[in-house]
A protein has these predicted regions:
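Conserved donor-binding loop and adjoining core beta-sheet/short helix segment
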Residues: 3, 23, 30-84, 184-194
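Short amphipathic alpha-helix that is part of the acyltransferase structural core
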Residues: 1-28, 123-157, 404
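Conserved active-site alpha-helix within GNAT-family acetyltransferase domains
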Residues: 97-111, 212, 236-253
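Conserved beta-strand-loop-alpha-helix junction that forms the acyl-donor binding cleft
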Residues: 92-98, 230-241, 257-262
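Flexible coil/turn and secondary-structure edge motifs
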Residues: 263-432
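Acyl-donor-binding surface of acyltransferase catalytic domains
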Residues: 60-130
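A conserved beta-strand-loop-helix scaffold within acyl/acetyltransferase catalytic domains
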Residues: 60-61, 161-200
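Conserved acetyl-CoA-binding loop-helix of GNAT-fold acetyltransferases
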Residues: 72-79, 201, 207-221, 242, ...
Length: 432
C-alpha cells in the first residue's frame, strides 16, 4: 500500500510514533514536515506499507530526500517517485537505505548519484569538566555569519542555499586573545534531544583542542538540562571522530548523503490531446528512450482514465518522454510535438473535446521556456493565428493504466484507425 500525504501535518500525525520514538535519527523529518503544504513535485511525503513493514519518505526542496524504515521497500518507493516524475536533489538516510534506494532508482530512471558524505551519528549523555567556551554575544554575530558560510563551503563545497539566521544565544565560542577561534551552535532542539552543529575552527588555530572545548561546553549544557546531545561527524575524518568519541560521544548509526548528478538523460512532459496518438509520434525518434502515457496538470494522485475524461480532476492526458540529450535536443522534441497537434485549438484536439484533451507544455526550465516562446512566435507569424498551447510549470505525472501504455506499438491497426477517425491524418500539419 502507498500513502500520498496531502501535507506535512497529515504525514506527521500519521507517523508521530515512528518519528518521535526514533527522534535522533528522524530529527530532520521533525524539522521539515511543517513546510510541506501539499503533495507537489518537489515537496512531498510518502509512506510504503507491506504488512508490518514500512518506509517513510519526505522531500523538501532544496534539501535531500529523507528516508526511514525497511530497506526491502526501497524499490517500491523508487518506482513511485520515478513514475510520478517527482524531483529529488539527493538522499540522506542510513547507509543501507541510501544504497538500496539509489540502486533501485537508477534502475528505473537511468539517473546517477554522487556520494557526498559518509557520516557517523554520535550521541552523548555524559558530562565532562570542560566548560571553557562561552555563549556568543550580539557583537559576535557578524563574524559568526562569516564562519557559518565558511563552514558550509568547506563541508559542502558550495555556499549555503539559504542564509541561516544567527541567534547569538544558541552559539558558543572559544576566544583566544579576544578573537573567536572556534564556534558551534545548538540546533533542532526537542523535548529530550538537542543537536550540535556548525563546528568550525579558524584554520590558523586548528589542532589546538579549541573545537573540543566548544563542543564539550555545549554538550554539558544540553545533558544538564536533561536531554541527549547528538552530532554528525564525517567518517572520512578520523581526527574529528576520535575527538568526539574521546569526550564521551558514541556511534548510534552510520548515515550517508548523496546528490543527483546532472546527466544527459532528461524528461519532458507534453499534453497533446489523446495520448495514444501523440505518443506514437515519438517512439521511433533516435535518442528517445521511453514514452509513457499518463495524466498531468491536476491535484489528485493516480486518477483513473474515466475520472480524467470526466473533466473533474483538472488533469490532461499527457506523455512523459525520457530522452538522451546527447542524441536529440529539447527543441527537436518540441518541434515534433507541434507538428503533431493543432496548436490553434484551445478546447481539445480534433475529435477529442474537453479540458482533458487540451494542449500544454510543462517546464520550469528557463532555457526551455525561451525555446517554447520562440517556436510560438514563429508559428503565429507564419500562420497569422493565435497559438493556444499552454505553458505550465512542471507538475506531478501519473502513469496511466497499463492498457494505455505503448498503444501504437501494441495495437498498430487500432492506432491507425484511431488516427483516422480522430481527424489527425486529414489535418494539414504545420511546418516549423
Amino acid at each position: 500500500m502507498v500513502i500520498y500525504y496531502k501535507n506535512g501535518d497529515e504525514f506527521y500525525n500519521d507517523n508521530r510514533e515512528i518519528i518521535d520514538n526514533n527522534l535522533i535519527e528522524n530529527s530532520f523529518f521533525k524539522l521539515n514536515y511543517p513546510a510541506i503544504m501539499g503533495f507537489e513535485r518537489k515537496n512531498f511525503c510518502i509512506k510504503i506499507i507491506d504488512n508490518e513493514k514500512y518506509l517513510i519518505a519526505l522531500n523538501r526542496d532544496p534539501y535531500n530526500l529523507l528516508l526511514f524504515g525497511d530497506v526491502s521497500l526501497c524499490d517500491k518507493l523508487a518506482y513511485e517517485i520515478y513514475s510520478h516524475n517527482l524531483h529529488i536533489n539527493g538522499v540522506l538516510a542510513s547507509e543501507d537505505l541510501v544504497n538500496e534506494f539509489c540502486k533501485s532508482y537508477t534502475k528505473y530512471s537511468k539517473f546517477k548519484f554522487d556520494d557526498l558524505f559518509s557520516m557517523g551519528l554520535l550521541v552523548s549523555n555524559e558530562v565532562s569538566d570542560e566548560n571553557d567556551a562561552q555563549k556568543a554575544s550580539i557583537e559576535d554575530i557578524k563574524l559568526l555569519q562569516d564562519y557559518d558560510k565558511k563552514f558550509h563551503i568547506e563541508i559542502f563545497n558550495e555556499e549555503p542555499k539559504i542564509d541561516h539566521e544567527i541567534i547569538a544565544d544558541n552559539y558558543y565560542v572559544y576566544k583566544f586573545n579576544n578573537e573567536i577561534v572556534s564556534c558551534a551552535h545548538k540546533t533542532r532542539e526537542e523535548e529530550n534531544i538537542c543537536s550540535i552543529s556548525g563546528v568550525y575552527t579558524n584554520p590558523n588555530y586548528r589542532g589546538k583542542g579549541f573545537a573540543r572545548k566548544v563542543v564539550s561546553t555545549i554538550r554539558n549544557e544540553i545533558v544538564k538540562s536533561g536531554k541527549i546531545a547528538y552530532l554528525y561527524v564525517d567518517n572520512n575524518n578520523p581526527i574529528s571522530s576520535h575527538l568526539y568519541k574521546s569526550i564521551g560521544f558514541k556511534l548510534l548509526v552510520n548515515r550517508k548523503e548523496v546528490k543527483c548528478i546532472e546527466s544527459n538523460i532528461k524528461r519532458v512532459v507534453f499534453a497533446g490531446g489523446c495520448f495514444w496518438c501523440i505518443a506514437g509520434a515519438f517512439y521511433n525518434l533516435d535518442g528517445v528512450l521511453e514514452v509513457y502515457s499518463g495524466y498531468s496538470g491536476g491535484k489528485k494522485v493516480n486518477p483513473s482514465y474515466n475520472e480524467v475524461k470526466s473533466g473533474t480532476t483538472g488533469h490532461m492526458e499527457a506523455i512523459m518522454i525520457e530522452y538522451d540529450s546527447d542524441k536529440i535536443t529539447y527543441e527537436n522534441l518540441l518541434k515534433t510535438y507541434f507538428e503533431n497537434i493543432d496548436p490553434f485549438d484551445g478546447d481539445g484536439q480534433f475529435i477529442d473535446r474537453g479540458s482533458s484533451y487540451q494542449t500544454a507544455v510543462f517546464t520550469n526550465n528557463e532555457n526551455q521556456k525561451i525555446i517554447f516562446e520562440n517556436i510560438i512566435n514563429d508559428i503565429q507569424n507564419k500562420y497569422n493565428k493565435e497559438v493556444k498551447v499552454k505553458l505550465l510549470d512542471e507538475n506531478i505525472f501519473n502513469f496511466a493504466e497499463e492498457e494505455h501504455q505503448k498503444f501504437a506499438i501494441k495495437h498498430p491497426d487500432k492506432y491507425k484507425h484511431e488516427e483516422e477517425i480522430s481527424g489527425r491524418t486529414k489535418f494539414n500539419k504545420i511546418n516549423i
